[in-house]
Structures are given as structure tokens and as C-alpha cells.
């Protein structure tokens, strides 16, 4: 029985209350709301701009709702890159996260993005807002050795900002000196997300 039994535990079971997860609600601006409305009301007309047809009308119809949800998730992260956006150069969530870093996180912080597009946007914006703070970027196309060097440089700073894709830094990477992690967008898979911030 012992050879065939595997005990699993969740991080929270042995970490207890050593961490705090806070959720922040950000009210979207008019330009962002316009993008959301366009996706909800005119998806059939704009679908071909974002997704390639399978060549089979039945498959395309079956995928329509999933694709609409995928585009809505993308719009919640980077609405300024989609058709119909008419607003500030950077969405409100980007500005909210920058203000959160400015007012509440004077030390190291990691910002985890779900897409490279979002990572590039946050890198650009946080670079503009915090020119005095060291800024580091990691994504999946960077080799593991290079990632380790970037993390070592980040560890040496007192107030560095690390912007990365959530998939690029998972459980195999440990940054013990960074106590603050911001997820700009949630993933479908909660355990994968937990691999990033734990």
C-alpha cells in the first residue's frame, strides 16, 4: 500500500498565512468599454480579423463562443491593441498597476503577464513611469541560462521591477527576495497561476 500511495498537499496547507492575496477591481475607461461592446455585439463581423477560419463552417460555428471568450480575455488585458479602442494610449489597468507600484511597493516587484503583447505594453509603460528603477524582462523565448542571469541581476537590486510572462517563470524558478507579485490578468488554470506567484 505504501509503494502505491502518493500524498499531495496544496501550498496553502503548509504555508498557512505567510502570504496574502489581494484582488483589485479596476473600472474600465470608455475606450475599453467600447472594445468590450464591439466584441459582444459584433463578434461575427470582426472574428476573421483575429482568428483564421478552419475551412469548415460547422467547426467555425462551434468555435465561435470559445473564440469570443478568448478575445474578451485579450481585451481585458490589452484593449488598446484591438479595433474599436479610442482612448488613452495605455488602458486604466496599466496605469492602476503603475500607481500601485509607486504608492505601495517601494521594493522589488514582479509583474506577471499572460501574453507577450501585454508584457511588452507593461515594459513600455513601467519604463516610462519608473526611469529610476531597474527594469527586467523575461519571456519564454529567452534561454533558461539567460533567465537565470536576469534573475540574478534582479536579485541584486533593491527596487527592481521584473516584467515577465507567467509561463516563463514557474515553479522551477525561485526569487526569494521578491515578496510582491502582481498578476495583470488571470489564467483559466489556477494551479498554473499559483506556480508563478508561489
What are these regions (language model features)?
Residues 106-108, 159-160:
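Pre-Walker A (Motif I) flank of P-loop NTPase domains
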Residues 11-43, 164-198:
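SF2 helicase/translocase ATPase core recognition
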Residues 1-86, 91-99, 103-107:
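Inter-lobe coupling linker of SF2 helicases/translocases
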Residues 34, 95, 120, 124, ...:
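Alpha-helical elements of the RecA-like P-loop NTPase motor core of helicases
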Residues 102-104, 153-157, 173-175:
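Conserved catalytic network of the ASCE P-loop NTPase/AAA+ motor domain
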Residues 108-115:
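Conserved RecA-like ASCE P-loop NTPase motor core of nucleic-acid helicases/translocases
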Residues 120, 132-166:
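Conserved helicase ATPase core of P-loop NTP-dependent helicases/translocases
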Residues 63, 87-95, 113, 141-148, ...:
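Conserved phosphate-coordination/catalytic loops
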Amino acid at each position: 500500500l505504501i509503494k502505491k500511495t502518493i500524498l499531495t498537499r496544496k501550498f496553502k496547507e503548509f504555508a498557512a498565512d505567510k502570504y496574502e492575496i489581494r484582488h483589485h477591481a479596476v473600472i474600465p475607461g470608455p475606450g475599453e468599454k467600447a472594445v468590450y461592446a464591439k466584441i459582444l455585439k459584433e463578434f461575427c463581423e470582426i472574428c476573421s480579423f483575429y482568428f483564421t477560419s478552419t475551412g469548415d463552417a460547422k467547426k467555425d460555428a462551434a468555435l465561435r463562443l470559445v473564440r469570443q471568450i478568448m478575445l474578451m480575455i485579450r481585451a481585458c488585458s490589452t484593449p488598446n491593441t484591438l479595433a474599436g479602442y479610442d482612448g488613452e494610449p495605455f488602458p486604466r489597468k496599466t496605469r492602476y498597476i503603475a500607481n500601485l507600484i509607486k504608492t505601495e511597493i517601494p521594493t522589488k516587484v514582479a509583474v506577471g503577464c499572460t501574453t507577450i503583447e501585454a508584457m511588452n505594453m507593461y515594459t513600455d509603460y513601467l519604463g516610462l513611469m519608473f526611469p529610476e528603477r531597474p527594469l527586467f524582462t523575461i519571456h519564454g523565448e529567452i534561454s533558461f541560462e539567460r533567465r537565470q542571469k536576469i534573475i540574478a541581476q534582479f536579485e541584486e537590486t533593491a527596487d527592481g521591477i521584473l516584467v515577465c510572462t507567467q509561463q516563463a517563470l514557474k515553479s522551477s524558478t525561485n526569487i526569494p527576495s521578491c515578496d510582491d507579485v502582481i498578476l495583470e490578468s488571470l489564467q483559466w488554470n489556477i494551479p498554473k497561476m499559483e506556480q508563478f506567484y508561489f
